[in-house]
Regions:
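Extracellular/periplasmic periplasmic-binding protein-like sensory domains
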Residues: 34, 50-72, 76-80, 96-100, ...
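Short, well-ordered alpha-helical microsegments
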Residues: 21-22, 109-111, 136-139
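Hydrophilic extracytoplasmic domains
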Residues: 90, 110-115
């Protein structure tokens, strides 16, 4: 429903190749989502960025930008020079073939995926980023790779109050489960 309200209809579900991958794929089929594709990536961060580059057609979008710059480089009129200045500020030219991403990952691996998406110039102005319950990892709030990250969650203030009260009562923090 959320994606529909946001008018997103070409979703990529990103999930790492791990022991539970097949289980997640089965659960996704049971949800009967529409217009989505699954993209499985290596949990190895050294391989991840290359895989995200392929997913986002990064090399082609980079070539598109260079070709477009060449068109305006030889022209002397002000409009062409203005356009060239705009192009010089970009890393790629062209859109990716999806408008929303659901990332089924956590912790540092999630941060690696977000960083790779930012590196490959996937615009959060055009693509909606969603992940799973991330409220237990406060460090994600301070990540600067993506400013608009959506995730289903409990009310964070209530959760923090619960943790504080639990600690005061039992002199221990509650389990994250």
């Amino acid at each position: 429903k959320f994606l529909k309200k946001q008018k997103k209809n070409k979703t990529i579900v990103l999930l790492p190749e791990k022991k539970y991958t097949r289980f997640i794929e089965n659960k996704l089929q049971n949800l009967q989502l529409k217009n989505y594709k699954i993209f499985k990536y290596s949990a190895d961060p050294k391989i991840l960025t290359g895989e995200i580059e392929i997913l986002t057609n990064y090399d082609q979008r980079k070539k598109n930008l260079e070709l477009r710059k060449k068109v305006f480089k030889d022209k002397d009129d002000k409009e062409s020079q203005k356009e060239l200045e705009k192009l010089e500020k970009k890393y790629t030219l062209g859109d990716v073939n999806f408008d929303s991403v659901i990332i089924i990952d956590f912790g540092s691996s999630l941060k690696s995926v977000l960083t790779s998406l930012a590196f490959t110039d996937v615009s959060e102005n055009k693509v909606l980023f969603t992940t799973l319950n991330q409220w237990f990892d406060e460090s994600i709030f301070y990540e600067n790779t993506v400013k608009s990250l959506y995730y289903p969650s409990v009310n964070y203030k209530e959760f923090k109050r619960y943790k504080d009260n639990y600690f005061k009562t039992f002199n221990n923090f509650p389990s994250e489960i």
